């Protein structure tokens, strides 16, 4: 007898320390492609061992096995099958002789495997969240079928969308010179992506269009919410041969950002928070560029911290690397003036300060008044309008 479990959305559960990544509608609308799970004795000629060189489509993501390596062996088999099915644009997934006979466990394993796959593969954007899991008793365990719904029944349309994304990726990366260091590439990709994407404003989280969660919405339509932005950064860094991971957690609602590896040290980057200052679309900031776990955890909560590498690097924090960090009261004025001088061609001034420095706004005003930095002062040169994010300050030039 065949049993069916209709999954309308991936339920947020904790299984072996792994939170389902897209359980919230803001993160969960645009998962992957067909799931097809099968072993070597099924579908002769289609089974291929999964590895990080396995290509789903022409977008050719290579850093794509981080979460795969966190799965159990059975979950890895499902994940491998998902990858093969997506590559072939197939709808029905099948697993022969799955060893776990408990239906609830099978459904959970499928969800965990799928979420790991989608977190590793930002290039997969064309399957609806709703899917069905079927189980059938067999001599060697249970056979499993997973049926997914594509966002389009037209395979040629999906392939055309992949081509559109590929062109946008090439446009962004065309000016990122290969001889540059990884940190310079990372900054340039961050800034170019922020320039091209607008944060999608919504009033009802359940009504966000599927595209706004995907690389297609971000790169082709120019709008996205957090996961669409983070997946786009993920795929661009991957193409630049910079190792990175998609991360899920919370600010107030579920949220996505990236972990990026530079010179063997990991850093957090939240491109959404660097782009989505409310009402400000004219500039990009770097308050959440290459920050440590300790720093980002003052505003963010990790959902799956135990699965992730520790991000403790400080050398390539944006403000440290650019020498936009003021470390003491004694050199505040001199350092601020150097930062202002080096930022003269920018429409904003941004820097960070040692957390022990107090009365930063007053010190800014005093320094700007003394040095006639009138382009940042308001109200008869007695006030400065600024954003304070973490330990960074962002001031928009007014003239």
Task: Put a short name on every predicted segment.
Residues 181-187, 195, 240-244, 263-265, ...:
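Loop/turn elements at helix/coil->beta-strand transitions in domains of secreted/extracellular proteins
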Residues 195-199, 204, 225-226, 251-254, ...:
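Solvent-exposed loop/turn segments at secondary-structure junctions
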Residues 228-294:
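Hydrophobic/aromatic-rich core segments of domains that either
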Residues 81-83, 220-224, 246-248:
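Alpha-helix capping and helix-loop boundary segments enriched in small/acidic/polar residues
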Residues 157-218:
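Secondary-structure boundary elements
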Residues 1-2:
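N-terminal hydrophobic targeting signals that begin at the initiator methionine
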Residues 5-180, 296-399:
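N-terminal accessory/pre-domain segments preceding catalytic cores
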